[in-house]
Amino acid sequence: MSRALSQRARRTYFNNPLVEESLRYLPAAVEHPTSSAFRAYLIAQLPQSSVQTRQRFAEYISQRFSQDGQMNLALARALARYGDSRTGREILYFEMLQASPVLQEIASLWLAELPPEGSSRDSLLAFLERRLGGRDSDRVATAAVATFRRCRKISSPKPAVYIPVWSEPSPEAFFYVLARLYPERAMVRVEQLAGQPLLRAMLWPRPCLPGMLEAARRAGHVSKISELDQYHQFTLADSAEVRLGRLFGEPSSPPPSPTPEPEARKDPVPPKPVKKRKPAAGAPRKSKRKGRAEPVQLPLLPQDK
């Protein structure tokens, strides 16, 4: 039986990034939404000949991209849409940072702080030893560098020298990250967004954010961008689920209209009796027959004696 990773293990250990396998197989999590069902699917589908290797890789992927036994379906839908493309790799990289705090720390506090000429593997090992106390530093460094290479976040002009690759994301990758960082409709300051450690770990140049937000406004993910005095802020248009559905081109179904409650049965109200006015003395009375007036008995005149 599989054993879930502890919070400490998630924070201090990272191994076997399996980027290519994740890109290829994670879209199937839409049909296998629980971690146990997806793990069984991976064991049957992974190409490795050894059953033990398939089980181990299936465990890594299913645990990395699940929470409380449920797979990350936003990621699965994104990879079903974008696959092995620049956008797909950028989205997968973001979710790997989310899933592995130690990888996020390496990216935001070591890789993003490197000078333009880069640095050596020794500096990465020194960084990890201060955080991990020497435990598995070499293995974690190897896995982190492999992830950065696969997700195109570093270049190596010569062995064991790493240069960070800062690049503006595709609009689709930015819209996805915006939805995952802010799941509810809200007003957000641009400074708050720019200060997110995750955004720094993505190696997105800070000057690109205003243009990305304007693209989000045109695409309907942001409803308003405003600059008030010293505040530069934007308002998200909808919930994350609505924005992701729009991003993936999924048909949006209107919410079902509430079923009207049956009205209580009411007894018919009898009409109020109409009080007839008495005709004035001497006025001709209407006949009950239509079109005829009923003669009126006039008082007799006195007779001459």
Predicted regions and their residues:
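Eukaryotic partner-binding/assembly regions in large regulatory complexes
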Residues: 1-102, 106-112, 118-119
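Glycine-rich, aromatic-bearing surface loops/beta-hairpins
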Residues: 4-23, 232-234, 243-256
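Short acidic, hydrophobic short linear motifs in intrinsically disordered regions
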Residues: 38-39, 116-130, 187-200
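Short amphipathic alpha-helical interaction segments
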Residues: 52-56, 135-147, 203-215
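Short, basic alpha-helical nucleic acid-contact segments in DNA-binding proteins
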Residues: 64-68, 144-155, 219-223
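Long, low-complexity, charge-rich intrinsically disordered regions
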Residues: 75, 236-305
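Eukaryote-skewed repeat-based solenoidal scaffolds used as protein-protein interaction platforms
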Residues: 107-166
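Accessory, usually C-terminal, subdomains that scaffold auxiliary metal cofactors
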Residues: 157-247
